[in-house]
UniProtKB/Swiss-Prot annotation:
Pfam families (UniProt xref): TrmO_C, TrmO_N
GO BP annotation list: tRNA methylation
Role this protein plays: S-adenosyl-L-methionine-dependent methyltransferase responsible for the addition of the methyl group in the formation of N6-methyl-N6-threonylcarbamoyladenosine at position 37 (m(6)t(6)A37) of the tRNA anticodon loop of tRNA(Thr)(GGU) that read codons starting with adenosine. The methyl group of m(6)t(6)A37 appears to slightly improve the efficiency of the tRNA decoding ability.
Matching SUPFAM superfamilies: YaeB-like
GO terms of molecular function: tRNA (L-threonylcarbamoyladenosine(37)-C2) methyltransferase activity; tRNA binding
Organism for this UniProt entry: Escherichia coli (strain K12)
Protein name as it appears in the record: tRNA (adenine(37)-N6)-methyltransferase
Annotated family: Belongs to the tRNA methyltransferase O family.
Underlying gene: trmO
Membrane-spanning residues: none
Positions annotated to bind S-adenosyl-L-methionine: P23, R24, Q25, H64, Q65, R92, V127, D128, G129, T130
Protein origin, superkingdom: Bacteria
Amino acid sequence: MSSFQFEQIGVIRSPYKEKFAVPRQPGLVKSANGELHLIAPYNQADAVRGLEAFSHLWILFVFHQTMEGGWRPTVRPPRLGGNARMGVFATRSTFRPNPIGMSLVELKEVVCHKDSVILKLGSLDLVDGTPVVDIKPYLPFAESLPDASASYAQSAPAAEMAVSFTAEVEKQLLTLEKRYPQLTLFIREVLAQDPRPAYRKGEETGKTYAVWLHDFNVRWRVTDAGFEVFALEPR
């Protein structure tokens, strides 16, 4: 059996500082912006010449936060409620024989300086610090297949949860938006996807959660109406 070795070509800088609450697929949180920083010796302007003409990219990356858990022949996809099992190759699970992921993201800008190449990205679904092993331009004529079928994931999951903010948090956000544009929308879109594990959905009102987004510990509680963000704590 052959084995292969690959070099890391870059690293992701993202508002998702932990894997909890990262969308399960790209494109679900449109306001999630980040950057891909190429590293030496790949941080050359020539390496990305012409890339600015493409609107979207495929990013191939390593599931670096789960790779120590090894692979599993069957997994429980969240889209099936976390109960039914499927073969790992019939899912996008992180627990794979080779911990490689792929993400389709929006390319907003290519920024080249003397010693750096930075790709500005949108609709990101990758945790901060994710190692990148390759990037490829998205080709609509070859990769957009409207007649394709996709079993249990034929359509995007609905944004299930209504998200509200306490008056105090709304006041904080008004000030923070000057430094973090679209922060309110970003938090709302992330939480609307209901990042809780499938087995915890339906929990009683009052249960609290927290997630690290940008430079803040975002704390919210379950209410009868959905989720209420009650604290933004600087980290």
